[in-house]
């Protein structure tokens, strides 16, 4: 039975549908949304090989005319040049304002497809079909779209909500173990910032490190709870005027790590895990939460088989990278810091000196 989570917004409300096997009914779900008949399905070659034909068959069965555009996998393809190629496909297939771009893939595909949809003809319809755990619980929900700039991650983008987010947990069976663990970092994040009960469930679970070992019912629960947390926050603050900033917990340091490692050696979820470790250590130093709570967070991250020790990075370069973060206000880097399991706050008390201390090898992971 499908779980339906509404994202309630003033102008563009939509539903998150979670159901095993639901990819085969993508066309049926979209046919209820009064969309035009043309669909541009955007994916990467590997995901398309696994699931593209299921999506295409479902869409065509529902009467849609389907065209495809494939983008090579990887954060280094998240560029304006790649977006221009999506535009070329949209032009070649004569997409209209009533047409729909469907993102079938992970966070990179979702971000790029959403940005292309937001900007082509000043906005065409957009549907998210996430195929990674990270995209299911985070990137596909909330309307953040965009691409990277050489100087920073997601600096070019727009808020543009999808018409539908369709989540089929069955597609996770082909997700590489490393990517599954990356998604668990975002799940843990929701436990720290919003849902102490979810955090406790994760602590009590037997295995979090792979799809093949995690309990199927638990997986459905953590996807649902994570989506509900994201939907609750986005419904209250669509464009990050205040509350929504808490979703960036761990991301300030994470984006710096990704930038300094060239978006190659450390993936987004791994960087978020390291960012949460750093934020937790900063919060302890500022007296905002206890060493015991911080250790619980570190232990849970390690339970998901995620690294908690910083890679060798130049602390000064990291501090400089933080100044390009989107959360900078009046030149001051704002950190999301934990105050208890299930609660965080926005702080401007974090100095460059404190960041350097936490990033030093003797401090990281503590």
UniProtKB/Swiss-Prot annotation:
Belongs to the sugar phosphate cyclases superfamily. Dehydroquinate synthase family. NAD(+) binds at residues 107-111, 131-132, 144, 153. Keywords: Amino-acid biosynthesis, Aromatic amino acid biosynthesis, Cobalt, Cytoplasm, Lyase, Metal-binding, NAD, Nucleotide-binding, Zinc. Catalyzes the conversion of 3-deoxy-D-arabino-heptulosonate 7-phosphate (DAHP) to dehydroquinate (DHQ). One of its GO terms (biological process) is amino acid biosynthetic process. InterPro entries: Dehydroquinate_synthase, DHQ_synth_AroB, DHQ_synth_fam, DHQS/DOIS_N, DHQS_C. One of its GO terms (cellular component) is cytoplasm. It is an enzyme of class 4 (lyase). It catalyses: 7-phospho-2-dehydro-3-deoxy-D-arabino-heptonate = 3-dehydroquinate + phosphate. It is found in: Cytoplasm. It comes from Microcystis aeruginosa (strain NIES-843 / IAM M-2473). GO terms for molecular function: 3-dehydroquinate synthase activity; metal ion binding; nucleotide binding. Its cofactor is Co(2+); Zn(2+); NAD(+). Zn(2+) binds at residues 186, 251, 268. This is 3-dehydroquinate synthase. Pfam families: DHQ_synthase (PF01761), DHQS_C (PF24621). Its EC number is 4.2.3.4. Binds 1 divalent metal cation per subunit. Can use either Co(2+) or Zn(2+). Pathway: Metabolic intermediate biosynthesis; chorismate biosynthesis; chorismate from D-erythrose 4-phosphate and phosphoenolpyruvate: step 2/7.
């Amino acid at each position: 039975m499908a779980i339906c989570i509404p994202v309630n917004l003033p102008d563009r409300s939509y539903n998150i549908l979670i159901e095993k096997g639901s990819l085969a009914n993508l066309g049926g779900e979209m046919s209820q949304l009064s969309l035009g008949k043309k669909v541009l399905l955007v994916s990467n070659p590997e995901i398309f090989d696994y699931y593209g034909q299921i999506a295409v068959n479902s869409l065509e069965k529902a009467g849609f005319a389907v065209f495809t555009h494939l983008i090579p996998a990887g954060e280094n393809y998240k560029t304006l040049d790649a977006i221009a190629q999506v535009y070329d496909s949209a032009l070649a297939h004569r997409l209209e304002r009533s047409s729909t771009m469907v993102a079938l893939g992970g966070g990179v595909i979702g971000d790029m497809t959403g940005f292309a949809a937001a900007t082509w003809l000043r906005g065409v319809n957009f549907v998210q079909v996430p195929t990674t755990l990270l995209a299911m619980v985070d990137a596909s929900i909330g309307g953040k779209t965009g691409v990277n700039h050489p100087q920073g991650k997601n600096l070019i983008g727009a808020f543009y909500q999808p018409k539908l987010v369709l989540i089929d947990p069955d597609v996770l069976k082909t997700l590489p173990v490393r990517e599954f663990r990356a998604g668990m970092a975002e799940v843990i994040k929701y436990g720290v910032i919003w849902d102490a009960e979810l955090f406790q469930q994760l602590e009590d679970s037997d295995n979090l490190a792979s799809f093949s070992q995690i309990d199927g019912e638990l997986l459905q629960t953590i996807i649902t709870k994570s989506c509900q947390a994201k939907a609750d926050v986005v419904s209250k603050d669509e464009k990050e005027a205040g509350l929504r900033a808490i979703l960036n917990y761990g991301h300030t340091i994470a984006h710096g790590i990704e930038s300094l490692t060239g978006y190659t050696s450390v993936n987004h979820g791994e960087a978020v895990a390291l960012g949460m470790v750093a934020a937790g250590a900063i919060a302890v130093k500022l007296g905002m939460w206890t060493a015991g709570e911080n250790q619980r967070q570190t232990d849970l991250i390690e339970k998901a088989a995620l690294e908690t020790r910083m890679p060798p990075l130049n602390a000064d370069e990291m501090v400089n990278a933080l100044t390009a973060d989107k959360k900078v206000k009046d030149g001051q880097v704002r950190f999301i810091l934990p105050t208890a399991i299930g609660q965080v706050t926005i702080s401007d008390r974090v100095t460059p000196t404190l960041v350097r201390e936490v990033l030093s090898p003797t401090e990281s992971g503590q």
